[in-house]
């Protein structure tokens, strides 16, 4: 394939990457864009053990007043599934807050496929997902542009959402699934498209997904890497490293990744100039839990490769409020 045809394909892929819901995300006039991440709610509709989850969501939304909400997997893990999603998303829909979803390894285990879950999530008002272009059983792999406050037709930042699947499908390899080759290729195409469109400068970007990359463990184990927050369990990444972190570093747009999956980890650590962060467990007693539930907040800053982030807990406590990269200069060995 010659170079001209390759650019045409990349540009077309970029056009298709725009969300189809009609929602358009834009930096506010003060140059900020705030995201609330909820993760691992393990919500079971009608189960009293999930009641605290339903207290958390409106408290955080009303206190933080975000521009967007992202749910990063293992959100509804009991029947009836559709009614569970209705209950969770009602809080953001009633407040007219755009939201996106990435699925975890448990969401599809209640007799509903990932594709069926994606279908009804995309049908919700204010949802900005769309069906993934990528096959291999992954759904809602999306890139979502955030447009400029003064240039509303120009992308100013990007939000990537990835489906990290569930469990290994390769015989002899145990544990959790990994980013596929097609997902990585798709990410590189999207990143290149927006970099070319931005006069060959990578846009500031964040990536949200459920299962941590193997680099999380490497990053935290290296004491020279500055970190904030707690690690109360060993990370549970896939056993195989398919190379997504390398591609993010090489493409140069992603500043940070935000995951869930490991319920009692809430740290953020600098690894080779990319922040690797956990959200805050947002569920309650339907699974193993930390002492209190909460959410992670991120505030992007227009025109800058930096962001603020903190944890907002059910009781209103704010923890680990930091700025990346300013607060993450690595220690000397």
Predicted regions mapped to residue ranges:
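Metal-dependent catalytic neighborhoods of phosphoester/phosphodiester hydrolases
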Residues: 48-49, 73-91, 108-126, 219, ...
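Bacterial Sec-dependent N-terminal signal peptides
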Residues: 1-23
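Extended active-site neighborhood of metal-dependent phosphoesterases/phosphodiesterases
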Residues: 86-199, 297-301
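Binuclear metal-dependent phosphoesterase catalytic core
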Residues: 38, 145-147, 151-153, 244-251, ...
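N-terminal active-site segment of His-dependent metallophosphoesterases
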Residues: 22-87, 91
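Acidic/histidine-rich helix-loop elements
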Residues: 36-54, 76-83, 109, 115, ...
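His/acidic metal-ligating clusters that form di-metal
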Residues: 65-67, 158-161, 173-266
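Active-site environment of divalent metal-dependent phosphoester hydrolases
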Residues: 44-46, 77-80, 101-112, 167-170, ...
């Amino acid at each position: 394939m010659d170079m001209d045809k390759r650019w045409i394909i990349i540009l077309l892929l970029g056009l298709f990457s725009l969300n189809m819901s009609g929602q358009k995300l834009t930096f506010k006039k003060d140059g900020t864009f705030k995201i609330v991440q909820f993760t691992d709610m393990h919500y079971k509709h009608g189960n009293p053990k999930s009641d605290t989850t339903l207290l958390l969501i409106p408290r955080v939304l009303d206190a933080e007043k975000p521009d967007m909400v992202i749910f990063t997997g293992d959100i509804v893990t009991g029947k009836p599934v559709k009614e569970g999603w209705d209950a969770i998303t009602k809080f953001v829909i009633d407040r007219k807050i755009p939201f996106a979803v990435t699925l975890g390894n448990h969401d599809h285990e209640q007799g509903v496929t990932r594709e069926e879950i994606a279908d009804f999530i995309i049908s919700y008002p204010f949802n900005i997902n769309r069906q993934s272009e990528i096959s291999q059983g992954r759904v809602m792999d999306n890139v979502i542009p955030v447009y400029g406050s003064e240039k509303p037709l120009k992308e100013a930042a990007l939000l990537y959402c990835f489906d990290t699947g569930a469990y290994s499908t390769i015989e002899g390899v145990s544990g959790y699934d990994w980013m596929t080759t097609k997902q990585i290729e798709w990410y590189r195409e999207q990143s290149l498209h927006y970099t070319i469109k931005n006069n060959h400068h990578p846009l500031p970007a964040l990536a949200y997904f459920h299962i941590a990359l193997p680099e999380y463990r490497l990053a935290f184990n290296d004491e020279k890497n500055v970190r904030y927050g707690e690690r109360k369990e060993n990370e549970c990444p896939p056993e195989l490293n398919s190379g997504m972190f390398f591609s993010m570093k090489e493409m140069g747009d992603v500043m940070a990744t935000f995951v869930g999956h490991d319920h009692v980890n809430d740290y953020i650590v600098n690894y080779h100039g990319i922040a690797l962060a956990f959200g805050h467990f947002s569920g309650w007693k339907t699974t193993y839990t930390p002492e209190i539930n909460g959410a992670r907040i991120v505030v992007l800053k227009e025109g800058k490769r930096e962001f603020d982030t903190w944890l907002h807990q059910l009781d209103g406590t704010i923890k680990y409020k930091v700025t990346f990269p300013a607060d993450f200069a690595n220690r000397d060995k």
